[in-house]
Amino acid sequence: MPRVKAAQAGRQSSAKRHLAEQFAVGEIITDMAKKEWKVGLPIGQGGFGCIYLADMNSSESVGSDAPCVVKVEPSDNGPLFTELKFYQRAAKPEQIQKWIRTRKLKYLGVPKYWGSGLHDKNGKSYRFMIMDRFGSDLQKIYEANAKRFSRKTVLQLSLRILDILEYIHEHEYVHGDIKASNLLLNYKNPDQVYLVDYGLAYRYCPEGVHKEYKEDPKRCHDGTIEFTSIDAHNGVAPSRRGDLEILGYCMIQWLTGHLPWEDNLKDPKYVRDSKIRYRENIASLMDKCFPEKNKPGEIAKYMETVKLLDYTEKPLYENLRDILLQGLKAIGSKDDGKLDLSVVENGGLKAKTITKKRKKEIEESKEPGVEDTEWSNTQTEEAIQTRSRTRKRVQK
């Protein structure tokens, strides 16, 4: 279900935002650092903007293997401006690389920010942002897998998402909309997952001062209704505990294919009250979602831990990771970095081998097409730097 920003729903229809017109293939745009980029074929279109393949400017055309995309919107629209603020503060390549080194991670699933600026075309001003390119989103794969992921896959995904959340939380932001459609795979490494869509990311702790808990009736039920936190249902600004609560709901849905309140999403008060009732009795939530004996105890322990967090409290991310690692151990597995996106049997927790037909469908879903609305990552930071060095030698 699409994200709903309660306080903005009415404003968006009356704001008369403008649609971005098509940019020509080969058009040159210059970012704020005076770096030139060349626009390639369009691969996506959002509500008010377009997404194109992009690469550093050269005499060559932008190939299908371009490492980046450019997201373009009319400069008087708001979503891209908001998203830019997050990326400029928290997603510079050097910031991400430093975090990876100090935390000894293999990678971090936060897209890198490569540049942004304004571009005039036919008397109109457009805002653009250069980003990594990605592959298929998890929602497509989840649906192709009969709306089930194996227990190992869910735990592996969640460990990487915890890495992401810890990073953005430490940089004063919360996401507020973790869900499968906002999780994209690295185009050439399907074992790497990235969290995208920071257009409504919230700076919960500007200059180190946490926002106070305050219920605002105008903001009730912000977010994607089936996953959004109880705080958001009550009109409270997003917080770290809210992101972790949302991840808990995602884990349950990925394992079972369904959340207890999904049959009545048109009644947000019912959804909120259901979440409150189950938060007070996590055991009943587990019984409802996992009627079989083979219940994932780590999910219950995770939910119990998250529900104890105060609004302004800093989570102990390592403790949460340990809980999920114990879950992997309980099924005879370990954190090997493999997502193993395969079909599961009859709604249970046991994985089976993916069929050739299903594998082909998933592979085809990774192909960049105009219908895709998010980014895909095909090459790394090193690839971009290699291209840059090569072109400098040619120019000499």
Swiss-Prot record:
Q: What is the effect of changing residue 213 to H?
A: Found in a patient with distal sensory and motor neuropathy; likely pathogenic; severely reduced kinase activity resulting in severely decreased phosphorylation of COIL, H3, H2AX, TP53 and TP53BP1; the orthologous mouse mutation results in impaired Cajal bodies assembly
Q: Which InterPro entries match?
A: CK1_Ser-Thr_kinase (IPR050235), Kinase-like_dom_sf (IPR011009), Prot_kinase_dom (IPR000719), Protein_kinase_ATP_BS (IPR017441), Ser/Thr_kinase_AS (IPR008271)
Q: Where is the stretch described as Required for interaction with the nucleosome?
A: 387-393
Give the enzyme's EC designation.
2.7.11.1
Biased-composition ranges, Polar residues, are: 375-387
Q: In which tissues is it expressed?
A: Widely expressed. Highly expressed in fetal liver, testis and thymus.
Coiled-coil spans in chain: none
One Gene Ontology term of the biological-process aspect is: chromatin remodeling
> Positions modified as Phosphothreonine?
355, 378
Q: Which reaction does it catalyse?
A: L-seryl-[protein] + ATP = O-phospho-L-seryl-[protein] + ADP + H(+); L-threonyl-[protein] + ATP = O-phospho-L-threonyl-[protein] + ADP + H(+)
Q: Which sites are covalently linked via Glycyl lysine isopeptide (Lys-Gly) (interchain with G-Cter in SUMO2)? A: 71
> What residue spans carry the Basic and acidic residues bias annotation?
360-369
Q: Where is the Protein kinase domain?
A: 37-317
Q: Name one Pfam family in it.
A: Pkinase
Subcellular location(s): the record lists: Nucleus; Cytoplasm; Nucleus, Cajal body
Q: What happens upon changing residue 263 to G?
A: Found in patients with hereditary spastic paraplegia; likely pathogenic; severely reduced kinase activity resulting in severely decreased phosphorylation of COIL, H3, H2AX, TP53, TP53BP1 and ATF2; the orthologous mouse mutation results in impaired Cajal bodies assembly; loss of function in DNA damage response
Gene3D superfamilies to which the protein is assigned, alphabetical? Transferase(Phosphotransferase) domain 1
Q: Does the keyword Cell inner membrane apply?
A: no
Processing and modification events after translation: Autophosphorylated at various serine and threonine residues. Autophosphorylation does not impair its ability to phosphorylate p53/TP53. Phosphorylation by PLK3 leads to induction of Golgi fragmentation during mitosis.
Outcome of substituting residue 219 to I: In HMNR10; uncertain significance
Family the UniProt entry places it in:
Belongs to the protein kinase superfamily. CK1 Ser/Thr protein kinase family. VRK subfamily.
Summary of subunit composition and partner proteins: Interacts with HDAC1, KAT2B, SETDB1, KDM3A and KDM4A. Associates with the nucleosome through interactions with nucleosome DNA, histone H2A and histone H2B; the interaction with H2A and H2B is mediated by the nucleosome acidic patch, a cluster of negatively charged residues of H2A and H2B forming a cleft within the nucleosome core.
Q: Name the chain's protein.
A: Serine/threonine-protein kinase VRK1
From which organism does this entry originate?
Homo sapiens
Gene that encodes it? VRK1
